[in-house]
């Protein structure tokens, strides 16, 4: 008896019925793997609804004629595997592999279904084209999710300053455990900045750290940075978000509580608040102090990095008001030993032991 709502089929070559059955199984299983990641990993209801609909549509077309042709015991491909299947070491790799698996299976259904089951062929084609776009959305969301998880766990952001041994100093900081680097360079030319940004991007990838670029959206896109950090006078958040996309991080410098409130309603991922102490980098900006930092943290849902003149001698006052994220320049970049300086700052940021 055929599935409900399906008309009878004519005679189908058992070999064709068997491969249609196998590829329907393949498609539905692969869609479920992707669906569960979108549900539990990304919490994206929109993607889950679409994937579930595709599974149900294919299920309605999985006729008993195809299932009865199944013969797993005599399948020469049963149990075969490839070394590449063992290399899926993160959710994005699993999603990409299963999307590819489903797309291939749907193409098989489309080709062999044309002569025996036109409705199956047309549905397979429609789902295959839809999956091409959904795969991009899912992978972008997965990358964004991973970046934001790293951001949420980040306590120490290193902001660079030009120096002859830039790469070595950043490398030492990353080795010590710094998980976010912001490339800031107001001197030199764009070719030099591009070379630096490429090298720092690769270095951060090696250490599993975030790499964001100060001000320059074009440079961030050119090196595929994890995000961009903008000041109050830079592009509006909605314009910047439109340029960098949803997957990249967008940080915003803030100096007042009004700045914080405004950023909290926009598509920002994190804030820098400062300067908390007087600093030579921005001598025209008055220090906001620990109390203002505490007030800012209380009115925003976003991670807030205290910035400005922070070092081991004054960090205690920030910790006393609940600060657990800082961004520094000189405390690491000007240190005699950047690795040790980074370790000491990270140690200071550890939550107190009861």
Residue ranges and their predicted role:
Residues 91, 152-167, 248-254, 306:
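Active-site mouth loops of central-metabolism enzymes
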Residues 15-18, 125, 129-172, 238, ...:
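N-terminal amphipathic alpha-helix/helix-capping segment at the start of soluble metabolic enzymes
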Residues 211-226, 255-267, 299-306, 310-328, ...:
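Catalytic cores of alpha/beta
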């Amino acid at each position: 008896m055929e599935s409900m709502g399906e008309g009878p089929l004519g005679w189908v070559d058992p070999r064709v019925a068997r491969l249609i059955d196998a590829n329907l199984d393949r498609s539905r299983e692969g869609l479920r793997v992707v669906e569960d990641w979108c549900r539990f990993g990304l919490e994206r209801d929109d993607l889950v609804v679409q994937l579930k609909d595709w599974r149900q549509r294919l299920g309605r077309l999985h006729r008993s004629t195809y299932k009865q042709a199944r013969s797993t015991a005599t399948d020469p491909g049963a149990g075969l595997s490839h070394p590449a299947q063992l290399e899926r070491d993160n959710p994005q790799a699993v999603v990409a592999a299963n999307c590819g698996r489903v797309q291939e299976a749907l193409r098989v259904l489309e080709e062999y279904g044309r002569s025996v089951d036109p409705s199956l062929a047309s549905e397979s084609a429609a789902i295959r084209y839809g999956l091409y776009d959904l795969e991009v959305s899912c992978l972008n969301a997965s990358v964004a999710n991973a970046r934001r998880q790293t951001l949420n766990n980040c306590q120490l952001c290193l902001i660079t300053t030009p120096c002859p041994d830039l790469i070595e100093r950043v490398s030492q900081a990353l080795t010590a455990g710094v998980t976010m680097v912001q490339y800031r360079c107001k001197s030199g030319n764009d070719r030099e900045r591009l070379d630096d940004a490429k090298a720092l991007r690769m270095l951060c990838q090696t250490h599993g750290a975030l790499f964001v670029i100060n001000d320059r959206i074009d440079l961030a896109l050119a090196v595929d940075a994890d995000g961009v950090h903008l000041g109050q006078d830079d592009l509006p958040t909605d314009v910047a978000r439109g340029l960098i996309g949803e997957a990249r991080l967008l940080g915003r410098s803030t100096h007042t509580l009004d700045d914080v409130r405004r950023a909290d309603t926009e598509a920002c991922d994190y804030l820098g608040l400062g300067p908390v102490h007087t600093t030579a980098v921005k001598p025209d900006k008055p220090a906001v102090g620990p109390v203002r930092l505490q007030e800012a943290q209380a009115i925003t849902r976003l991670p807030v990095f205290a910035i400005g003149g922070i070092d081991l001698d004054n960090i205690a006052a920030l910790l006393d008001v609940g600060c657990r994220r800082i961004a520094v320049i000189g405390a690491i970049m000007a240190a005699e030993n950047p690795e040790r300086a980074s370790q000491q700052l990270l140690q200071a940021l550890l939550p107190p032991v009861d």
